[in-house]
Regions:
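Short alpha-helical transmembrane segments in multi-pass integral membrane proteins
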Residues: 1-14, 72-139, 183-234, 291-359, ...
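N-terminal transmembrane alpha-helices
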Residues: 2-39, 55-66, 71, 96-103, ...
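Transmembrane helical elements of multi-pass membrane transporters/channels
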Residues: 12-31, 133, 167, 196-200, ...
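Small-residue-rich hydrophobic transmembrane alpha-helices
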Residues: 44-104, 141-160, 265-327, 364-383
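Hydrophobic transmembrane alpha-helices of multi-pass small-molecule transporters
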Residues: 56-59, 171-175, 200-205, 274-278, ...
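Structural signal for membrane-spanning alpha-helices in multi-pass inner-membrane proteins
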Residues: 106, 149, 175, 179, ...
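Short runs within selected transmembrane alpha-helices of multi-pass transporters and secretion channels
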Residues: 133-152, 163-171, 189-202, 284, ...
Length: 452
């Protein structure tokens, strides 16, 4: 990793990452497609109401996983492999146990959670059943991306991709089996999702059990490793948790402003946005191990080059993806609708919503890149400021104002306006960090890890 070109290293990580993350994202997309095609728009609305539980679970994983991955990459760059194993093992043990305990504690409150997410009486039964199944299998849904990020940092991105693809294919098969063959309703989609993640975890675990890389389990536990990882992972965890709150806010605003029909519409917009967002996030994740390793090795010129390359990639890919989505909007919408539900007015309104909403993703790609980059080199405060701005910072202010004065149109324009403002914040933070010498002065990180 010291000598290879940044472009070569980026694509070495990015290509498997984008395939693995798109495979992960298709869990939700496949749920929406099968539910919509078999059960209709009301079922899509019910599943969309339950959707915030997914960012919530991923936020919990990122709180420990992304921070631990940055620290592990930092230690590997310094050739301190046993410390890297201590961080990996401690975080994995803690997350597995705590995720199981938390999910079992929340299970009796499934109906309360569904109502909190904005479900009305018509959607409550389906939303509740979906949430119950997801909670029962949530430990696999947390461990899958956690194991994935450690495998990537252990220089096995192809294995991470294969695990995600296998799990995704299993999810597709079982979605079809439970919904179309057994006809068990929306809970069948939830069961398929859990099974897919469980299979993905099993594929990844053999890498650690068989000690195929530098990272494997050791019989030690360090609470300070967990705490340091959590501190380092706060920005990305906040981003994902805020995404859960954002979906809740949009669902609530749309339900009050325009009703269930437009909640279904927003569900389709968000399902189709998954691959767009995932690709942008994969760009950021692709530079993370390179930036962390280079910073640990004190190669600041390489750190700067990684950042510049990542920004260019995020901008170009964002523009290309927006163009693809703009010209394929009608085709993408029909993926989630029964033929009888594809009325011209609904289609036209959904296309308009997509074309407005997705402008925000062009800015989001570069903002995400800045947030993940600063997190990768342990600039947690800067990363947190950027993260807060692109998640809830502006949305929570703009959404009630614009929805009040402009109705549903105000809701759609909220997202791109908020992301443009967040991008300006990211530029300001980057300027501040450059003035502080982020690319010219190495700062030894005070990572509180048990000495080995």
């Amino acid at each position: 990793m010291h000598k290879d070109s940044i472009r070569k290293l980026f694509f070495y990580y990015f290509i498997p990452l984008v395939f693995s993350m798109i495979s992960l994202s298709t869990y939700s997309m496949v749920d929406g497609m099968f539910v919509g095609k078999k059960l209709g728009k009301e079922a899509i609305a019910a599943v969309n109401i339950a959707w915030p539980i997914f960012p919530g679970l991923i936020a919990y994983e990122l709180l420990f996983g992304f921070g631990a991955a940055s620290i592990v990459g930092y230690f590997l760059g310094q050739n301190k492999t046993h410390r890297a194993r201590l961080v990996f093992s401690s975080v994995f043990y803690f997350v597995a146990l705590s995720a199981f305990i938390l999910s079992m504690a929340l299970l009796p409150f499934s109906e309360t959670i569904a109502r909190f997410f904005g479900s009305n009486d018509a959607l409550l039964s389906m939303s509740k059943r979906y949430i119950e199944i997801i909670l029962m299998g949530s430990v696999f849904m947390v461990l899958h991306p956690l194991a994935d990020v450690f495998v990537v940092n252990d220089k096995r991105p192809v294995l991470a991709m294969v695990a995600m693809l296998i799990g995704s294919l299993a999810n597709i098969f079982f979605n079809y089996w439970f919904i179309f063959v057994l006809e068990v309703g929306v809970q069948g989609s939830a069961i398929a999702t859990v099974i897919g993640h469980a299979i993905g975890v099993l594929v990844l675990m053999q890498h650690f059990w068989l000690k195929k890389g530098q990272l494997y389990f050791i019989k030690r536990f360090s609470l300070s490793s967990v705490i340091s990882s959590a501190k380092s992972g706060v920005p990305q965890s906040t981003a994902e948790f805020s995404a859960s709150i954002m979906i809740l806010l949009f669902n609530t605003a749309i339900m009050h402003t325009a009703g269930e029909r437009f909640v279904s519409m927003y569900g389709i917009v968000m399902y189709n946005a998954i691959i767009f967002f995932t690709t942008l996030f994969a760009i950021s994740q692709g530079i993370q191990p390179i930036a962390s390793f280079s910073y640990g090795a004190r190669n600041l010129e390489r750190v700067r080059a990684v950042f510049v390359f990542g920004l260019k990639a995020a901008f170009c890919i964002g523009i290309v993806f927006y163009g693809v989505y703009y010209f394929l909007d009608e085709f993408l919408i029909k993926l989630y609708l029964q033929p009888s539900e594809q009325d011209p007015l609904f289609m036209q309104e959904t296309k308009r919503a997509m074309n407005i909403y997705y402008v925000g993703y062009v800015f989001l790609g570069m903002t995400l890149l800045c947030a993940v980059f600063f997190q990768s080199i342990q600039r947690t405060k800067s990363s947190f400021i950027i993260t807060l701005s692109h998640t809830l910072g502006f949305i929570i202010v703009l959404l009630p104002i614009l929805s009040h004065f402009y109705g549903i149109n105000g809701i759609w324009v909220t997202y791109p306006i908020a992301q443009f403002l967040a991008f300006l914040v990211a530029l300001g933070v980057t300027y501040y960090e450059i003035k502080k010498g982020v690319f010219t002065t190495y700062k030894e990180q005070n990572l509180v890890i048990l000495k080995t």
